[in-house]
Amino acid sequence: MLDGIGFEPRAVRVVSGGTATTVQDWPGRQRLWAVGVPPSGPMDDLSFRLGNRLVGNPEGTAGLEVVHTGPTLTFTSPARICLTGADFGATLDGAAVSRGVAVDVEAGQTLSLGRASGGGIRGYILIAGGLDIAPYLGSRSTFELGQFGGHAARRLLAGDTLHLGDGAMEPALPAAALPRLTNEWTLRVLYGPHGAPDFFTADDIDEIVAAEWQVHYNSNRTGVRLVGPKPRWARADGGEAGLHPSNIHDNPYAIGAVDFTGDMPVILGPDGPSLGGFVCPVTIAKAELWKVGQVKPGDKLRFHPIGFQQAQSLEQAQLGSLEAMAAISAVTTSGPIIQGSGVRKATHSAAAPSASRPDTPSVHSLSGVDMSGQGCGHGKECASPAPRPAAAAPG
């Protein structure tokens, strides 16, 4: 009698893991920076948080970060997902899947992500309810270098099984306008922490900011290396700290600090070191860090200096838009969100369908947030002050 009874867990089975698919959550591990534990978490936190909002997850819900080439996943039970970040040409049982909108997946369906195309290199798969993974040091984020967190403390491999969580969920939200990903970026930066003219003169800093930099192939979650003109230094060496002028006595680093390791700048990432002995003349504004998660080898970027108040306003605008999304009243509606053969419908929340295309969910834009990758440092997004820190400070 029991022979005919089968059990299928609420899970996702990994058919192939892709290049580097890991479990991450936001804001990652906090208050451990002083003992050398980085926060980890999604490199493009804006896309990650946006996806969680769209499927109705609270902040802190774990999802998947996909890099360069994506995984193939089979769902053993119904689920609701949202894809954000770079375009990986995702398909569900062969039908194209839109990004930036909640999608219902049926039991037995297979989600396949290919290679990232266009701008950006990281994508995110957010699942309603999250993933049933035990936190480590307060977070489910994977820290591969430290070999802890996430699923088995590593990137996903074929044969893995991820159990779905039972996290509290709100109704799904309308489709959102995703940040535009490009191959040419402008990153708004704050002057410092090492702004003393002993390291770089004002003219030296002007040259660094005016230069066009190219993303080096040896870039990852630890840091993004940049190739560009050799910097001029205000001194011949580092004195008692070292032979090169970039050498200083060990000091704490900030995530997003532009760290000159010799003559090569490195933008420190969420898996980077918490301290070191190199000069950091500028730091990426916290609201701009999502762009660092999307730059890929060969991309070009420039730095644009802004002030502390302006950086605060940028962060507050970003936070306010995400909070506004969470406060939208849920109105259940349906619309096809998978294009191609075998179109399926997913339940999502929207104020009203598009007038021009009644089958298209309405789009919610992150008002006041630089979604272009080309920050000019002026305009609507800089209008309102905020009491929050501007640069990513040690957690």
What do these predicted ranges mean?
Residues M1-R357, P361-G395:
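Conserved "landmark" site that anchors the functional core of diverse proteins
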